[in-house]
Design a protein with these regions (language model features):
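Non-heme di-metal
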Residues: 1-279
Length: 279
């Protein structure tokens, strides 16, 4: 398998591990698997660095991913099989792949041990389309508004993670690099939050593919200018939804996200200014 194809496989593996962490109900298991999803994301970052250094182009194409399972054990077995498919394409003589092999063999061993204890099994309700939110009583209007918001924003955060990762990989400017890292971290938090909320409502879904036109040969300054406008709109959406939803806990979370968008605007304007100064 060539490195470009391997990159696609690693991208898909990151999503499979990440969305498994959202789908599982047990908090301890969720957190354990999420930690490995973040390791898979680091693998992806290192591999993108490797591709750039070797002047090999890459993109964020992916095949359709069928993530729906009925039990925790089905997920554990699924992830073991998916990891094995990736590992067989690594060159263990290269340090980057030796590291990936070490990480993923440990993860497979952990999943194998989890499979040995029936207490770790459990029903998965992330796809039951109940559109309920635990014991919270949401009216129909609130449910509809929250459902639409989660589908739109989960894709948007996934898109931003990939776009900022791509721009970060190709920038030579340390300030821009650090700003992109902050934005990636923020979007990781938001995607985790929205993914878990979708799972709780039984509407979990893998985001659609991010098209090449959004990141390859992109005018980054214009992207950031447009991004400021999008962040302002996102703030308004969060504020409107927080006001519309008849639940204090969810409203407070959305208000928190709204204020996070404020700081995103500050960071993006700082990056725009730096780009202007370097021209």
């Amino acid at each position: 398998m060539n490195l470009t194809k391997l990159y696609q496989s690693k991208h898909e593996l990151w999503l499979k591990v990440l969305f498994t962490s959202f789908a599982i109900n047990d908090e301890k298991l969720k957190n354990t698997i999420y930690e490995f999803a973040m390791i898979e994301f680091r693998h992806l970052k290192w591999l993108s660095n490797n591709l750039k250094e070797n002047n090999i182009s890459y993109n964020y194409e992916k095949y359709a991913i069928e993530i729906e399972k009925k039990t925790n054990f089905e997920y554990f077995e699924y992830l073991i099989n998916e990891i094995k498919l990736c590992v067989k394409n690594y060159n263990p003589e290269e340090p980057i792949f030796a590291r990936m092999i070490s990480d993923e063999y440990y993860f497979m061993n952990l999943l194998g041990r989890l499979l040995q204890d029936e207490k770790n099994d459990g029903e998965v309700t992330a796809f039951d389309k109940s559109r309920t939110f635990g014991d919270k009583e949401l009216d129909c209007k609130s449910r509809d508004a929250l459902t639409l918001f989660l589908f739109e924003e989960s894709y948007k955060e996934y898109e931003l993670i990939l776009l900022y990762s791509y721009f970060q990989n190709y920038t030579q400017d340390i300030l821009q690099y650090n700003i992109y890292q902050d934005m990636i971290d923020e979007s990781q938090f938001h995607l985790k939050s929205f993914g878990n909320m979708m799972a709780k409502m039984g509407i979990l879904a893998i985001p659609r593919t991010v098209i090449e036109q959004l990141y390859i040969n992109k005018d980054i300054k214009q992207f950031l200018i447009d991004g400021v406008d999008e962040e302002i709109k996102a703030k308004e959406e969060c504020a409107n939804l927080a006001a519309a939803i008849k639940d204090e806990e969810i409203s407070k979370f959305l208000t928190c996200v709204m204020y996070q968008e404020d700081y995103h605007i500050v960071l993006m304007k700082k990056a725009i200014k730096k780009i202007e100064l370097t021209k």
